[in-house]
């Protein structure tokens, strides 16, 4: 009941083609196999226990992410709740991953130019799209509360309807439904939600985000909106509609709407001049890299992030506050002082007079 309704609403804005595309399916399988076999022998060996035949398909192993948290909003906090990852048996990932790539190809095939999905794309593509989209004045961002935990039975109904519409094998759809409704671990059974580690995590999160946007806002068709997982930013103020208010109240997914004249997306600030990274964050990461004697391994990545603001020249002064400019100048000083460590072509940007 809910699946076909949600699919219909999605197709109104993104008219997916239901016909099976043999070439796309072959490409999806090849891309998946190539990515898996490109991993180092050490990585494959470390993950060999995930190929154990005694590991049940509907059982996951729960791990806690141990990486440094570098989000801007989490600076100077004493502690933050750990993010969990659920690992699946290799056969489960190999079963679903090629078809998820196929769905992504079908989505990109018909995606209107007014929408942008930041998946498999470089920063130059994002920068070009943002400049074309003219992010000026009041823009709209959606910040979701507990996004992964809110991917409940209604979203699964949409995913199943989508897979049937695209003609995916029925046994695959039944397998997906079984795992979503029966998944457990040593801790016990899980509620229906999204888990980091699923083959479909980013794709289906992005599509759920798009679906919520289509249901929640009055769209005229000329808005430019970018999506990536639970991130969304539109180049104008979007107004809420109440057409589907009854259904939206059923969803666990709740959005905190922010209308701002300083829009951001995936950690990048957006403007009509292009994208640039919040400099305080980059400077603090550079300081951490210096403290941990890891600067040589990551300075190229930070230099690339800073380069988008650096290439704007004097125009960046109109975009940044005094605090941001100070952090930006500090970033540039650190990079130029250590530019002998740069190994990529980005070095030439900082050597130009």
Curated annotation (Swiss-Prot):
InterPro entries: DNA/RNA_pol_sf, RNA-dep_RNA_pol_alsuvir, RNA-dir_pol_PSvirus
Listed GO MF terms: ATP binding; ATP hydrolysis activity; RNA binding; RNA helicase activity; RNA-directed RNA polymerase activity
Domain (RdRp catalytic): residue spans on this chain: 137-244
Keyword ATP-binding: yes
Matching CDD domains: Betaflexiviridae_RdRp
Function according to Swiss-Prot or TrEMBL: RNA replication. The central part of this protein possibly functions as an ATP-binding helicase.
Family: Belongs to the potexviruses/carlaviruses RNA replication protein family.
UniProt name for this protein: RNA replication protein
Native source species: Potato virus S (strain Peruvian)
């Amino acid at each position: 009941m809910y699946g076909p309704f949600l699919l219909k609403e999605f197709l109104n804005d993104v008219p997916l083609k239901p016909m099976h595309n043999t070439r796309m399916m072959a490409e999806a399988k090849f891309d998946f196999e190539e990515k898996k076999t490109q991993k180092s022998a050490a990585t494959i060996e470390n993950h060999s226990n995930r190929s154990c035949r005694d590991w049940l398909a509907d059982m996951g192993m729960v791990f806690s992410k141990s990486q440094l948290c570098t989000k801007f909003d989490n600076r100077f906090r004493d502690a933050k709740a750990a993010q969990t990852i659920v690992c699946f048996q290799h056969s489960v990932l190999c079963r679903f991953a090629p078809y998820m790539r196929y769905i992504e190809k079908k989505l990109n095939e018909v995606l209107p130019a007014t929408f942008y999905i930041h998946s498999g794309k470089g920063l130059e593509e994002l920068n070009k799209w943002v400049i074309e989209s003219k992010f000026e004045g009041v823009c709209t961002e959606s910040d979701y509360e507990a996004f992964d935990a809110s991917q409940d039975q209604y979203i699964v109904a949409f995913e199943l309807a989508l897979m049937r519409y695209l003609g995916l094998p029925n046994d695959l759809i039944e397998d997906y439904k079984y795992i979503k409704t029966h998944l457990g671990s040593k801790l016990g059974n899980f509620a229906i939600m999204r888990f980091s580690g699923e083959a479909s995590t980013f794709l289906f999160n992005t599509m759920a985000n798009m679906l919520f946007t289509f249901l929640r806002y009055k769209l005229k068709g000329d808005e430019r909106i970018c999506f990536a997982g639970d991130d969304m930013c539109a180049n104008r103020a979007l107004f809420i509609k109440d057409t589907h208010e009854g259904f939206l109240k059923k969803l666990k997914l709740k959005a905190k709407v922010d209308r701002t004249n300083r829009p951001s997306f995936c950690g990048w600030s957006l403007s009509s001049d292009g994208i640039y990274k919040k400099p305080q964050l980059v400077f603090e990461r550079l300081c951490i890299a210096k403290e941990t004697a890891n600067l040589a391994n990551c300075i190229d990545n930070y230099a690339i992030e800073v380069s988008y603001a650096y290439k704007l020249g004097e125009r960046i002064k109109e975009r940044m506050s005094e605090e941001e400019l100070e952090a930006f100048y500090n970033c540039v000083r650190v990079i130029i002082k250590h530019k002998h460590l740069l190994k990529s072509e980005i070095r030439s940007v900082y050597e130009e007079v």
